[in-house]
Amino acid sequence: MRRTLIFNAVLCLPLLATDARLTPEEREKAIGAMKTSQQDYIEALNNVTEAQWKWKPTAERWSVGECAEHIVLAEALLFGKVQEAVNSPANPEWETKTKGKIEFLEKVMPNRLGKAKSPLEIEPKGNMSKEEALKLFRQGRVQTSAFIAETQVPLKEHTAEHPFPVFNTLSAYQWYMYIPWHTMRHLKQIAEVKATEGYPKD
């Protein structure tokens, strides 16, 4: 009898494991965040003049144009990390390695908590026009939005490493959510630039 109970318990273990697939709620959360951040990005840039695009509060701070350029560059890099994770073998320790990080990302990224130096490959050069930024942003979002709406990959069990120790291992889903939340973070930065004394009126 004891052996039978143990055997049955072992058989049930896989059924008790957390499902690595997205729940309908998680997929909807991602789609909603992408839609909101896309609308907000376009609205933030729509009426910006060339003078406003290039104006910098200080030599060290980014202009509206540089923030917008950084967002475009970062979205491409971040979706590349999603693809890197998806193309990697499933991580058997994904639950332990990624636990609590979606909540942490949602807390620190959109709210601009913590400061970090941007990687060189996504530092703005200051030579991207508003029209180019909007075009590249929209093009990138066609791909990223279609991905999350259609994918059946169990995104949570595929991981890729973040260069910042505070994040370390992130799942493909967490890397994906990084995209809209990072954009929201820098849209707040754009709002700060616009609210700075000396920002051109036109």
Residue ranges and their predicted role:
Residues 55-104, 149-150, 154-202:
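Short, contiguous alpha-helical
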Residues 4-13:
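Sec-dependent N-terminal signal peptides
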Residues 139-150:
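Amphipathic alpha-helical packing segments from all-alpha helical-bundle domains
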Residues 34, 133-137, 176-179:
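Hydrophobic packing residues in well-ordered alpha-helices of helical domains and bundles
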Residues 16-29, 80-137, 161-167, 197-202:
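Short, helix-capping/interhelical loops that line the mouth of catalytic, cofactor-
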Residues 27-55:
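N-terminal targeting signals for Sec/Tat export/insertion, comprising classic cleavable signal peptides
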Residues 37-44, 74, 78, 115, ...:
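Amphipathic, well-ordered alpha-helical segments in soluble domains
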